[in-house]
Amino acid sequence: MNPVFTPNVAQKILFIDRDGTLIEEPVTDKQVDNLAKLVFEPQVIPALLRLQKAGFRLVMVSNQDGLGTPSFPQEDFDAPHNMMMQILSSQGVKFEDVLICPHFNDENCSCRKPKLGLVKDFLTQGFIDFTQSAVIGDRHTDVELGNAMGIISFQYQRGSLGWNAIADALLNKGRSATVVRTTKETDIRVTVDLDNASKGTINTGIGFFDHMLDQIATHGNFKMEVNVDGDLEIDDHHSVEDTALAIGDALRQALGDKRGIARFGFSLPMDEAKGECLLDLSGRPFIKFAAQFEREKVGEMATEMVPHFFRSFADGLRCTLHVAAEGDNDHHKVEALFKVLGRALRQAVKVEGDVLPSSKGVL
């Protein structure tokens, strides 16, 4: 087991080739076996620093043909390799692990890329966030390794896909997610895009509920697509509950590791009805709901499902949520609750920097 990574804690990891990717690969003999051959690839250190700052952890994965044999003595490898590691470390670049296959191709070992031997622990111990991790290397075998691991890959080429371009591609992935939730009672598809304020399509089969979900997206300033096929011939319970779970889950996935977000949100608009929302994207589901309704339904939506929506939403998003409403009109009170949730979300998901807003180092 790798002591640097915690089992079953999925993290953003970049598996990076060495020769031809981090440093130049000599054209003549393909071996970096003395200090004179040690030349870094352009922009590699600034790019790695950007990626580290965004929460990526770095692992080096390299084939070194015949390492430790007369054709490539260990001491010839060590001098330039150790200097490379010292330079990287002096500039703030930290590789959590260095994985090397020393075998020739014809030895048919299990660890030579693109085989999975070198990264077996990462795959079996639950270290990898498969949605955000990647392989970076200059050869097609690196691409094949990424395919075998089930993560994306970037085939480095100094002229056409250099380090700045790779870092940009990894860092500028939109904060969006799609969740499909299918049960015996409902078939639901939710897509959220936190960095897109255009209007989405919402169709739950419950007109008033559609209007309320639109309030969340509109006041949250993000795009949300919701399509629900539920057992409305019975009642609205399953449709509302499962939709809330799916929306919360989609928002949680879109937020990723939450690095740079404000984390907290608060809203207290005052109209005929007062709605209040305190939100903490804490990773821990908790709900405190305070509102009373006189009517059994608002539109086609049962008012008893309003607190249930917020509880299920908090479970799906894994957030701490305090919501309350006061007023004389049930329609206005319900609408105030959904509006303030959207407003609080707008504050909480806003990117303000690149630091994880938690003393624990995880949310």
Curated annotation (Swiss-Prot):
Residues 175-363 are annotated as: Imidazoleglycerol-phosphate dehydratase. Zn(2+) binds at C101, H103, C109, C111. Pfam families: IGPD, PNK3P. CDD domains: HAD_HisB-N (cd07503), IGPD (cd07914). Mg(2+) binds at D17, D19, D138. It catalyses: D-erythro-1-(imidazol-4-yl)glycerol 3-phosphate = 3-(imidazol-4-yl)-2-oxopropyl phosphate + H2O; L-histidinol phosphate + H2O = L-histidinol + phosphate. The active site is at D17, D19. SUPFAM superfamilies: HAD-like, Ribosomal protein S5 domain 2-like. It is found in: Cytoplasm. GO terms for biological process: L-histidine biosynthetic process. It comes from the Bacteria. Its cofactor is Mg(2+); Zn(2+). Its EC number is 3.1.3.15, 4.2.1.19. The keyword Metal-binding applies. One of its GO terms (cellular component) is cytoplasm. Pathway: Amino-acid biosynthesis; L-histidine biosynthesis; L-histidine from 5-phospho-alpha-D-ribose 1-diphosphate: step 6/9; Amino-acid biosynthesis; L-histidine biosynthesis; L-histidine from 5-phospho-alpha-D-ribose 1-diphosphate: step 8/9. Residues 1-174 are annotated as: Histidinol-phosphatase. Keywords: Amino-acid biosynthesis, Cytoplasm, Histidine biosynthesis, Hydrolase, Lyase, Magnesium, Metal-binding, Multifunctional enzyme, Zinc. The keyword Cytoplasm applies. GO terms for molecular function: histidinol-phosphatase activity; imidazoleglycerol-phosphate dehydratase activity; metal ion binding. HAMAP family: Bifunc_HisB, HisB. In the N-terminal section; belongs to the histidinol-phosphatase family. In the C-terminal section; belongs to the imidazoleglycerol-phosphate dehydratase family. This is Histidine biosynthesis bifunctional protein HisB. It comes from Shewanella oneidensis (strain ATCC 700550 / JCM 31522 / CIP 106686 / LMG 19005 / NCIMB 14063 / MR-1). The lineage of its organism: Bacteria, Pseudomonadati, Pseudomonadota, Gammaproteobacteria, Alteromonadales.
